[in-house]
């Protein structure tokens, strides 16, 4: 009698009903590799009295702020792999890694150092897991049957990876988050050669983000964002006194562009905000950003002192601040509330970031813009390109890898279904080769047959 063995199980623990709290686990022959441990930030921000670092994983799970990892809690976990350094992928490491004490955590150098920063701030759990910086192209054997590999890809944070879990049944490829940037201003490139090799070697399952798959285009290069910024800041008609730019603190390429623009304008770039200090500090350690001519303000005293100087000679500075989503406590939000700096008609605020599409962010950004408008501030919006793959990026990845099965991830249900529709266009059948899952469910992938 024939029976199916060597089944691969995909535990879809977080990020399969929302954009956030990403966590997936891959089981083969009783051994598990976890990929990502993220948070859902809006579920933390919506409660004013929540102190994330001091809370238990149980309480945060009830808030819907971190993934529910109970389906794999008693499994034999052999490794934790982190795809990149965004908080919706690493923000819960301090809360969830302690459930798997001493299990090694792997990622690229920038990702691991950001994870260490998160762990350092953890106040509820002690984290004993060793963390290892892994280079692109290195294949790490984590058990007799399983190995992991980080393949270079482009996204809106340095050293992002497509994570590959090698099994005797073929590769499980985790592509959350990515885009194909062929003209990155600072030389980052997708490793097309390795992706094509994987396709030839045999990809069993592709787990792919679906955030922007409904957009019928290819996501533009970061070079386009650089051009948009230069086109605004460096044209002859620029008459602004005070210039304030805001973008994602982790978007190191964008921050580098702003430093270079400030230098060309004869202005000093000044970074203000704790998260900007953290991300640029670690990037500088690794040689990922050149801070020439700029300053980073860390202490509240330095911020208030320097902003007094800036207000007397606004034309000499480009302020780069936190707060593009209108987050409470961020620098731009505080300025709009009349704190720190007398922002007004002499100032121009440049938003080099889109609005994250959840109701809390939309509401907070609306409140921020309204306050700035009431103060007479000029606003320039959408000098930005996304870091997420659009439909044609996804189509190319499917064709390169030629996976047997596809599990859409990293999105609300409607996003996952849009990905499934693309897979159908590429010849896959929903329910047979494409599986739409939910948080807490398991997708069972048939293994080889032996008698």
Curated annotation (Swiss-Prot):
Activity regulation: Inhibited by 1,10-phenanthroline.
CDD domains associated with the record: RNaseJ_MBL-fold
Residue positions binding substrate: 384-388
Activity's thermal dependence: Optimum temperature is 95 degrees Celsius.
Cofactor(s) named in the record: Zn(2+)
GO cellular component assignments: cytoplasm
GO terms (BP aspect): RNA catabolic process
InterPro entries, per database record: Metallo-B-lactamas, RibonucZ/Hydroxyglut_hydro, RMMBL, RNase_J, RNase_J_2, RNase_J_arc, RNase_J_b_CASP, RNase_J_CS
Chain sites annotated for binding Zn(2+) 2: 88-89, 177, 410
Amino acids binding Zn(2+) 1: 84, 86, 155, 177
Localization terms from the record: Cytoplasm
Assembly: Homodimer.
Sequence similarity: Belongs to the metallo-beta-lactamase superfamily. RNA-metabolizing metallo-beta-lactamase-like family. Archaeal RNase J subfamily.
Protein function: A highly processive 5'-3' exoribonuclease; no evidence has been seen for endonuclease activity. Prefers 5'-phosphate or 5'-hydroxyl ends; 5'-triphosphate substrates are very poorly degraded, does not degrade circular RNA. Does not degrade pre-tRNA(Trp) suggesting it is inhibited by strong secondary structures. Also degrades ssNDA but not dsDNA.
Miscellaneous notes: Mutagenesis of His-410 to Val in the T.kodakaraensis homolog (AC Q5JH57) reduces exoribonuclease activity to 1%.
Protein name, UniProt field: Ribonuclease J
Organism of this sequence: Pyrococcus abyssi (strain GE5 / Orsay)
Lineage: Archaea, Methanobacteriati, Methanobacteriota, Thermococci, Thermococcales
Gene label: rnj
């Amino acid at each position: 009698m024939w029976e199916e063995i060597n089944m691969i199980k995909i535990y879809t623990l977080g990020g399969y009903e929302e954009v956030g709290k990403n966590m997936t686990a891959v089981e083969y022959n009783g051994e598990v590799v976890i990929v990502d441990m993220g948070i859902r930030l809006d579920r933390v921000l919506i409660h004013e009295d929540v102190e994330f670092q001091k809370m238990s994983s149980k309480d945060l799970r009830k808030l819907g702020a971190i993934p529910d990892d109970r389906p794999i809690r008693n499994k034999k976990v052999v490794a934790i792999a982190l795809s990149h350094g965004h908080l919706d992928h690493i923000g819960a490491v301090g809360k969830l890694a302690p459930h798997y004490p001493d299990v090694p955590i792997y990622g690229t150098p920038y990702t691991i150092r950001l994870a260490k920063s998160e762990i350092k701030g953890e106040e509820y759990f002690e984290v004993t897991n060793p963390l290892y910086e892994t280079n692109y192209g290195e294949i790490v054997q984590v058990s007799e049957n399983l190995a992991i590999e980080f393949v270079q890809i482009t996204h809106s944070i340095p050293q992002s990876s497509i994570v590959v879990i090698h099994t005797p049944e073929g590769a499980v490829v985790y592509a959350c988050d990515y885009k194909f940037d062929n003209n990155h201003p600072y030389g980052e490139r997708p490793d097309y050669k390795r992706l094509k090799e994987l396709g030839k070697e045999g990809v069993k399952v592709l787990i792919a983000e679906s955030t922007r798959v409904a957009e019928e285009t290819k996501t533009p290069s970061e070079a386009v964002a650089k051009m948009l910024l230069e086109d605004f800041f460096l044209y002859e008609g620029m008459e602004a006194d005070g210039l304030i730019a805001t973008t994602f603190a982790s978007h190191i390429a964008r921050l580098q562009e702003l430093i270079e623009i400030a230098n060309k304008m004869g202005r000093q770039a000044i970074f203000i905000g704790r998260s900007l200090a953290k991300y640029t500090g670690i990037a500088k350690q690794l040689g990922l950003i050149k801070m020439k001519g700029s300053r980073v303000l860390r202490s509240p005293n330095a911020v208030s002192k320097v902003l007094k100087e800036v207000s007397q000679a606004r034309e000499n500075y480009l302020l780069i601040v936190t707060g593009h989503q209108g987050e409470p406590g961020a620098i731009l939000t505080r300025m709009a509330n009349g704190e720190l700096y007398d922002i007004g008609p002499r100032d121009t605020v440049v938003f080099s970031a889109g609005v994250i599409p959840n109701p809390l962010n939309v509401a907070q950004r609306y409140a921020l813009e309204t306050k700035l408008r009431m103060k007479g501030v000029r606003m320039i919006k959408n000098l930005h390109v996304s870091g997420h793959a659009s439909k044609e990026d996804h189509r190319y990845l499917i064709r390169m890898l030629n996976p047997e099965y596809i599990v859409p991830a990293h999105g609300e249900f409607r996003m996952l279904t849009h990905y499934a529709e693309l897979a159908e266009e590429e010849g896959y059948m929903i329910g047979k080769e494409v599986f739409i899952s939910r948080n807490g469910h398991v997708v069972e992938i048939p293994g080889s047959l032996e008698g």
